[in-house]
């Protein structure tokens, strides 16, 4: 919507962000993405805190107020390319998306490389933009052997390329998030 794009642009400029992403919701209203946190669990690499949270039971997660900490716009380690804003010149200066990561983690890798180059500019998740997203609707889930193998190899490439980031708890959450 125009509101979401305008809000993302304003947030991006206000924080002088290198990358800005949006809170994404499943059609049911559950949280799909609210910024990505690094985890030290090698089989996951990154995850979204409060992913799957039932917003029907926790209305404050969807309200316009900021009563819940993850309902506030915040800095995070990465955002998903499902809704990501970045200046073209910044995108090109770091080489764009890594084509070795054909399906998964190319957005996370982009965020990590952007933050490495532009250390003083934050990656922001704008939670006042709530967008409904049909995760993996067009490409399907990674639920067969071939897709699972590709996902595994792409995760290993990400971890090997940015190994230093996976040796300590997530910088912005201060904890090593367990899986939900």
Which role fits each region the language model picked out?
Residues 20-23, 126-127, 134:
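Short glycine/serine/threonine-enriched helix-capping/active-site loop
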Residues 2, 105, 148-152:
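Non-membrane alpha-helical structural segments and their capping/turn regions in soluble enzymes
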């Amino acid at each position: 919507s125009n509101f979401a794009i305008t809000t993302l642009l304003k947030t991006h400029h206000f924080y002088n962000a290198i990358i800005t992403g949006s809170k994404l919701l499943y059609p049911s209203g559950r949280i799909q993405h609210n910024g990505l946190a690094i985890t030290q669990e090698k089989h996951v690499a990154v995850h979204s805190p409060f992913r799957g949270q039932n917003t029907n039971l926790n209305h404050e997660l969807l309200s316009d107020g900021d009563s819940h900490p993850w309902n506030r716009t915040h800095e995070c380690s990465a955002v998903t390319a499902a809704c990501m804003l970045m200046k073209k010149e910044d995108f090109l200066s770091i080489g764009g998306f890594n084509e070795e990561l054909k399906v998964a983690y190319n957005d996370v890798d982009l965020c990590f490389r952007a933050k490495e180059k532009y250390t003083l500019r934050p990656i922001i998740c704008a939670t006042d933009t709530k967008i409904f997203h049909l995760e993996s609707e067009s490409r399907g889930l990674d639920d067969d052997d071939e897709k699972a193998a590709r996902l595994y190899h792409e995760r290993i490439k990400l971890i090997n390329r940015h190994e230093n980031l996976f040796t300590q708890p997530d910088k912005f959450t201060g904890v090593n998030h367990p899986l939900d």
